[in-house]
């Protein structure tokens, strides 16, 4: 029998607030079965599958306890910025997409019976039922408004702790806090008052602004990937590093060094911490905190005696956009409580990028070097590219079965990585 697939788009009334797209099939019990992502390279025993495509610019993602997937889009698709994805026939592929929320953004998180989301200037939450389904998609509570967004690095990543606090990244909109038209850094950097840090707000209070929150940590240029580590009960973040060393300071940095520096860095962050931007950066080659050239540095002078040290460092310009501490049991024991990182860019030094990396942890600290876990999302050899980049990993989530989901914000593909135990 020929498969007949009907695509029905229903704009549901204000009673629900959903835009609903369903795939209906006749005569085929597996009309949209997940297809293997044969180009994605994963370790032995693992497999990658494509469970959804053409989602739009899919940023962060969260999976409910029943397996529903909520994904945040950085641009609206059919007028909606959040989509609930559902596999109704359990064939491994998404066949129902339900859109809601009329704002784009990056952040999304489930905690304490609520779905938390963000736009580039605000934070919202939606009440969930016992199945972690959104009850009133057209009536979110507004938790925070008025966050800085000035056209560069505007995404507001979010995470919620166990004490009803929500943490929000507010990135810098300036690469190094230079005075306009000069190579000199502003001292003190005025951006630090309202950006380049993590702000803490109440997760259960509406209509908050900067004045209601706490600048939890400062000196972080841009954090897109962040997660709450359940083993340490602390916040971990991934910082995007700065650039343009050779452009502004050719007397101190060669083009090669400019491609190698600074490191992308992982920090364990506590209240009052300062990671040092814009005054210093971390050099993973020298393994030192180096004084920024805008503030008197020459590529060798150290600085930041009172700033925190990174717990892990990675090659420059790889763009860490997702961070997830793995707590599942599907993957082998060595992955338990370790950190997965989605890298959204590439390293000129390694000619590698657009990958998911893994850092093993023991007793709440990295216990070994980082490694490539899932690779070749780019779809081309970055050392000798033969075509455009195909996919850019961005968000990470753990499914109720322990599988790992990876979003792609370039072409809107959703991947699921699973492990099959040897028989």
Predicted regions and their residues:
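Blade-level signature of beta-propeller repeat domains, shared across WD40, Kelch, NHL, RCC1
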Residues: 397-423
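Conserved beta-propeller blade signature
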Residues: 68-72, 114-117, 165-169, 234-238, ...
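Residue-level detector of Asp-centered blade-edge/turn motifs that repeat once per structural unit
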Residues: 63-66, 110-112, 160-163, 227-232, ...
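Beta-propeller domain segments
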Residues: 26-42, 155, 172-211, 220-222, ...
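Beta-rich catalytic cores
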Residues: 54-57, 78, 96, 103-104, ...
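Surface loop/turn motifs at the tips and blade-to-blade linkers of beta-strand repeat domains
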Residues: 51-55, 98-103, 143-150, 214-219, ...
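Beta-strand-rich domains and repeat architectures in extracellular enzymes and scaffolds
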Residues: 49-74, 319-325, 341, 345
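Asp-box/WD-like beta-propeller blade repeats and closely related beta-sheet repeat scaffolds
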Residues: 96-97, 105, 121-161, 217
């Amino acid at each position: 029998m020929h498969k007949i697939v009907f695509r029905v788009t229903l704009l549901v009334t204000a009673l629900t607030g959903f835009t609903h797209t369903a795939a209906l099939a006749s005569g085929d019990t597996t009309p949209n079965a997940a297809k293997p992502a044969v180009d994605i390279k994963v370790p032995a025993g693992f497999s990658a599958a494509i469970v959804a495509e053409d989602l739009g610019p899919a940023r962060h993602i969260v999976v409910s306890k029943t397996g529903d997937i909520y994904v945040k889009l950085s641009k609206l698709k059919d007028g909606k910025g959040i989509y609930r994805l559902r596999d109704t026939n359990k064939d491994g592929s998404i066949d129902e997409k339900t859109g809601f929320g009329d704002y784009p953004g990056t952040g999304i998180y489930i905690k304490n019976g609520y779905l938390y989301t963000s736009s580039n200037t605000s934070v919202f939450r939606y009440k969930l039922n016992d199945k972690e389904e959104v009850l009133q998609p057209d009536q979110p509570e507004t938790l925070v408004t008025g966050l800085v967004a000035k056209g560069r690095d505007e995404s507001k990543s979010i995470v919620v702790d166990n004490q009803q606090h929500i943490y929000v990244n507010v990135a810098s909109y300036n690469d190094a806090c230079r005075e306009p038209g000069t190579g000199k850094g502003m001292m003190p950097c005025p951006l630090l008052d309202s950006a380049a840090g993590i702000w803490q707000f109440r997760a259960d209070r509406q209509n908050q602004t900067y004045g209601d929150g706490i600048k939890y940590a400062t000196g972080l240029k841009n954090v897109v990937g962040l997660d709450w580590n359940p083993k340490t009960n602390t916040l971990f973040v991934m910082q995007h590093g700065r650039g343009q060393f050779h452009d502004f300071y050719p007397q101190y940095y060669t083009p090669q060094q400019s491609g190698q520096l600074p490191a992308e860095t992982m920090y364990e962050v506590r209240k009052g911490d300062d990671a040092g931007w814009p005054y210093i950066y971390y050099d993973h080659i020298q393994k030192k905190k180096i004084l920024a050239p805008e503030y008197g540095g020459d590529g060798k002078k150290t600085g930041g005696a009172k700033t925190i040290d990174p717990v892990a460092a990675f090659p420059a310009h790889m763009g860490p956009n997702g961070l997830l501490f793995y707590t599942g049991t599907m993957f082998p024991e060595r992955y338990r409580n370790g950190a997965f990182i989605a890298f959204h860019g590439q390293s000129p030094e390694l000619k590698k990028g657009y990958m998911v990396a893994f850092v093993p942890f023991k007793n709440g600290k990295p216990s070994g070097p980082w490694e490539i876990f899932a690779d070749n999302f780019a779809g081309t050899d970055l050392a000798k590219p033969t075509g455009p980049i195909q996919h850019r990993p961005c968000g990470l989530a753990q499914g109720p079965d322990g599988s790992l989901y990876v979003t792609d914000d370039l072409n809107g593909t959703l991947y699921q990585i699973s492990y099959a135990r040897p028989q």
